[in-house]
Amino acid sequence: MADCCVRTCPRPMCIPPSYADLGKAARDIFNKGFGFGLVKLDVKTKSCSGVEFSTSGSSNTDTGKVSGTLETKYKWCEYGLTFTEKWNTDNTLGTEIAIEDQICQGLKLTFDTTFSPNTGKKSGKIKSAYKRECINLGCDVDFDFAGPAIHGSAVFGYEGWLAGYQMTFDSAKSKLTRSNFAVGYRTGDFQLHTNVNNGTEFGGSIYQKVCEDFDTSVNLAWTSGTNCTRFGIAAKYQLDPTASISAKVNNSSLIGVGYTQTLRPGVKLTLSALVDGKSFNAGGHKLGLALELEA
């Protein structure tokens, strides 16, 4: 007799994001495509041997300060190793070594050090991250002469629902210096995120992909003990495969617009402007220009 039973496969579980990436889709709509008050150049190249070079330079139009960074990265895929060297115009040198999916699947260990020859200041950090279905854990240890600081986070996810906790324990003071909690829900085109930081800062964000070319985001924040509430709306529209326009406004009447155009493969230009709606005729508005080159 034929087997009439119908087998249903269990719904695949997704790996939740890290605590720092909760609400990232909404933040990206507010942050990407804008660069007010800066003239910026980013260059990314890759050698034949697989070494990646990233250079970034920017000039602040208000202060005239010029800053830059240089980063080289080499991935030894056979052993899951990544070596990164960093330098910036503050003359701070950084070295990072990471190993991923070698000790066990989903585990990443990172050793990060920085050194400033001008001041002699040194710092070291060991980072660990473990992610599997329904869970994303992180634990970092900052080494300091006064005593290490321990940063921990955990995010749990089930059928689109997310819950996370983040803490920092300062061993020198023997107390928690940070205690944050977040709850969220996400689907393919909708994300909701709420968070409480140290019991005093409350925030929330909504991300909605209205259609294939149009994304919107709403952000709300409030601090207890004050009457200050921060509210903002942002949107991004993809004009065509090579061009997009972004806009945002907040309750302080600050209006930002940005236009991004891919001039050719590997060359991207971004123009942005920030207008103060409360003092439109008084000036103080900001412009921004960014050029990204990748080869």
Curated annotation (Swiss-Prot):
Residues with N6-acetyllysine modification: 32, 121, 278
Site (Involved in ceramide and phosphatidylcholine binding): 85
Residue sites binding NAD(+) per the record: 254-256, 272-276
Keywords carried by this UniProt record: Acetylation, ATP-binding, Ion transport, Isopeptide bond, Lipid transport, Lipid-binding, Membrane, Mitochondrion, Mitochondrion outer membrane, NAD, Nucleotide-binding, Phosphoprotein, Porin, Transmembrane, Transmembrane beta strand, Transport, Ubl conjugation
InterPro entries in the record: Porin_dom_sf (IPR023614), Porin_Euk (IPR001925), Porin_Euk/Tom40 (IPR027246)
Record localization: Mitochondrion outer membrane; Membrane
Entry-linked PANTHER family: VOLTAGE-DEPENDENT ANION-SELECTIVE CHANNEL, VOLTAGE-DEPENDENT ANION-SELECTIVE CHANNEL PROTEIN 2
Subunit field text: Monomer, homodimer and higher order oligomers; formation of higher order structures is necessary for scramblase activity. Interacts with ARMC12 in a TBC1D21-dependent manner. Interacts with KLC3. Interacts with SPATA33. Interacts with PPP3CC in a SPATA33-dependent manner.
Entry protein name: Non-selective voltage-gated ion channel VDAC2
Top-level taxonomy: Eukaryota, Metazoa, Chordata, Craniata, Vertebrata
Gene that this sequence comes from: VDAC2
